[in-house]
Amino acid sequence: MAQFFKAKPNSSKQLSAKLSLSVNQLDHLGAGIAQHQGKVVFIPGALPDETVTVQLTEQKKNYARAKLIKVDTPSSERVEPECPHYHTCGGCDLQHMSLSGQREHKEAALLDIMAKFAGAEGGALSPALTGEGWHYRRRARLATLFDKNTKHLSLGFRAASSSNVVPISQCQVLAKPLSDLIVPFAKLLNQLSAKASLGHLELIAADNGHFAVLRITKALNDKDLAKLSAFAEQHQIHICLQDNEGQFQGVGAELVLPVYQLLDDKAESDAVSLSFTPGNFVQVNGQINKAMVAQAMDWLAPAPDERILDLFCGMGNFSLPLAKMGADVIGVEGVAEMVTQARVNAKANNLDKLTFYHGDLSADLSLEPWMGKIDKLLLDPARAGAFESLQWLKKMKPRKVVYVSCNPASLARDSAVLLERGYRLQQLGLIDMFPQTHHIEAMALFELTK
């Protein structure tokens, strides 16, 4: 019999009564769904086919929310969370469900959203892109909190829906070498005279080593720098400091940039690497990112001299491999710093059939120098999606569109636009980028039919 104790969420009305409810399904955010007095009740932590004791925390006209008090009849999918911080840390929210159950739920949720909001029921369901369920994150940002009374600095993750920092000793989804650095780093930071002026700590596992980025709000003195330098040497890690202006400075050595390989099992002549500054966005799951890039290459099937447009291209995660396969690639990104790094990456990989542009992809694109007829289109937008960019489909007329999504809701909305413009959904597949969480990512292939 599992017991759960979590901080009370913000609510419009607190009710003290405890109820016994039967859970029939999960919502798209991973919360259990039950019925009570004609209302849908959302219960984080509950699973389908469970009988649970809950306490209502919020009541609206058509739904209610409840806190899970006790699992009376557990689901066959319920498992014991591996992380000792699971019930307080806000990082993971599905560790109580088997990995196979998580993936089955995510795939069903993806199909449901696409059918309900896009009317997209056609197309072949591609096998889900899956990898390791634990220690898969190659990057994580830990928060710090300095207690003025005890003079102690806590290092950990934010609690769910809170600014409170939960001190942690390990992270079961973080790469093991990075997880093993959490306790030593917490001890080190508490030895610094500037510990009250420290911000977050970012840990990165790259193909060329391990990295730590420490946010500082004022310059460190020589003694603190010496301690950081000694720690870096002892643990064989690159440490750099990020100041208030966003500038980076290496500790004890020149600043080294992390590097990732984008494709697996490639000869050195076919390898594609991506370097980045610590402030840039990169996919945190390296194993899945490689599988995702490979699947995008397979679905787009770039041919030499085809004109392929990569919108929301970042630093070249897809653009670089596309150009390596001989296509004429145009990458467009809204963050200027990432465009600069993308150009650096193109040069480092000796790719000359690749041009990057900086631009606002939610604005009028009609006069952009890259706008015009293309053969194929790749989209990898943020959670807001690519709705504005898709309004220019008629001018671009790509035969194929591969859409990589981190938000099924915006994917469904944008898919409706593609279907209205004469495209057919040919492939749809789950990308399990974040095991142990409710987050759903997906890839879809559309082909022009008229």
Curated annotation (Swiss-Prot):
Write one Pfam family the protein is assigned to: TRAM
From its record, what is one biological process in GO terms?
Answer: rRNA base methylation
UniProt KW keywords: 4Fe-4S, Iron, Iron-sulfur, Metal-binding, Methyltransferase, rRNA processing, S-adenosyl-L-methionine, Transferase
GO molecular-function terms, A-Z = 4 iron, 4 sulfur cluster binding; iron ion binding; RNA binding; rRNA (uridine-C5-)-methyltransferase activity
Q: Which reaction does it catalyse?
A: uridine(1939) in 23S rRNA + S-adenosyl-L-methionine = 5-methyluridine(1939) in 23S rRNA + S-adenosyl-L-homocysteine + H(+)
Keyword presence, Phosphoprotein: no
**The UniProt record lists the keyword Oxidoreductase:** no
Kindly list the positions annotated as binding S-adenosyl-L-methionine: 283, 312, 317, 333, 360, 380
**Top-rank taxon:** Bacteria
- Active site, UniProt feature: 406
Which residues hold [4Fe-4S] cluster?
Answer: 83, 89, 92, 171
Q: Which InterPro entries match?
A: 23S_rRNA_MeTrfase_RlmD, MeTrfase_TrmA_AS, MeTrfase_TrmA_CS, NA-bd_OB-fold, SAM-dependent_MTases_sf, TRAM_dom, U5_MeTrfase_fam
Enzyme Commission code:
2.1.1.190
- Domain annotation TRAM: ranges: 12-70
Query: What PROSITE patterns has UniProt attached to this entry?
Result: SAM_MT_RNA_M5U, TRAM, TRMA_1, TRMA_2
Q: What does this protein do?
A: Catalyzes the formation of 5-methyl-uridine at position 1939 (m5U1939) in 23S rRNA.
Family the UniProt entry places it in:
Belongs to the class I-like SAM-binding methyltransferase superfamily. RNA M5U methyltransferase family. RlmD subfamily.
Put simply, this protein is called 23S rRNA (uracil(1939)-C(5))-methyltransferase RlmD
Query: What is the phylogenetic placement of the source species in the record?
Result: Bacteria, Pseudomonadati, Pseudomonadota, Gammaproteobacteria, Alteromonadales
UniProt gene name: rlmD
